[in-house]
Amino acid sequence: MATVLRAHSEHATWRDYLELTKPRVVLLMLITSLVGMFLATRAGVPWTVLLFGNLGIGLCAGAAAAVNHVVDRRIDSIMARTHKRPVTAGRVSPAAAIAFALLLATAGMGLLLLFTNQLAAWLTLASLLGYAVIYTGFLKRATPQNIVIGGLAGAAPPLLGWVAVTGHLSAEPLLLVLIIFAWTPPHFWALAIHRKAEYAKADIPMLPVTHGEHYTKVHILLYTLVMFAVTLLPYAIHMSGPLYLVCALLLGARFLHWAWVLYRDSKPHAAINTFKYSIWYLFLLFIALLADHYLLLNI
């Protein structure tokens, strides 16, 4: 493995290998994982779990992303957003990228097994395989519902963080997964509308390509309504308090606004603006969960 990586060191820089891990995507995942850890306990999270647990989850997420670069290199070469990625551009060979992914996954699993618990480690591995193999290798090319079905893998981080602390499953982290699961379709379908021509050229059956933009916009609006309702459940089951409820209502109302604007096609660049807002939405929603958790502890 080290030989493969060294063989391409003349062409690739550390930035290329960092790019393989999709660091911005992984950062958002780690924020939700971190929130899951803190929500799991009324006491402090042990620093070893906090540090090495999140590092292990992040390394495994980076490994899945690196595999995605290899499997999607033909698609990436067609799309303007991705044609300069390291594997597609030839700066990192597919073999080197896979070796790098194996290295990250091994290190990540090792950290999780050493510093958290077996359930957290195996759930993380299942999430890695779900994204890298089931979604990237099969679903993405097989069905316009690829994002809906494959969204479970991407929704796992708060569950992984929670289980890393507690060592067992419960309803609360599954609700956090459900929030991200409901958020995923409007998030990705908005981008798919913006990049519809490129997905069509790459022969990827994204919903706007197979069913048209109007159909997709209707479903973005419907999923946003579902997501809005789901985000109120933490308050309904007394998992969170008034601060979170107010934030969820305000953030959700803004998301619904963008989904409606996109549906009505009433503003230019509505699709990409909906996509961009959705990223901030998820980040701020989970920060609100965290802030509310500690506010309740101090009351």
Curated annotation (Swiss-Prot):
GO cellular component: plasma membrane
UniProt cross-references to Pfam families, sorted A to Z: UbiA
Location in or out of the cell: Cell inner membrane
TM region positions: 25-45, 47-67, 95-115, 119-139, 147-167, 173-193, 218-238, 243-263, 279-299
Key words of the record: Cell inner membrane, Cell membrane, Heme biosynthesis, Membrane, Transferase, Transmembrane, Transmembrane helix
Listed EC numbers: 2.5.1.141
MF GO annotations: protoheme IX farnesyltransferase activity
Membrane protein topology class: Multi-pass membrane protein
GO biological process terms held by the UniProt record: heme O biosynthetic process
Record pathway: Porphyrin-containing compound metabolism; heme O biosynthesis; heme O from protoheme: step 1/1
Superkingdom of origin: Bacteria
Catalytic activity: heme b + (2E,6E)-farnesyl diphosphate + H2O = Fe(II)-heme o + diphosphate
Enzyme class, broadest EC rank: transferase
Note: Carbon 2 of the heme B porphyrin ring is defined according to the Fischer nomenclature.
Function: Converts heme B (protoheme IX) to heme O by substitution of the vinyl group on carbon 2 of heme B porphyrin ring with a hydroxyethyl farnesyl side group.
Similarity annotation: Belongs to the UbiA prenyltransferase family. Protoheme IX farnesyltransferase subfamily.
Name of the protein: Protoheme IX farnesyltransferase
Higher taxonomy: Bacteria, Pseudomonadati, Pseudomonadota, Gammaproteobacteria, Pseudomonadales
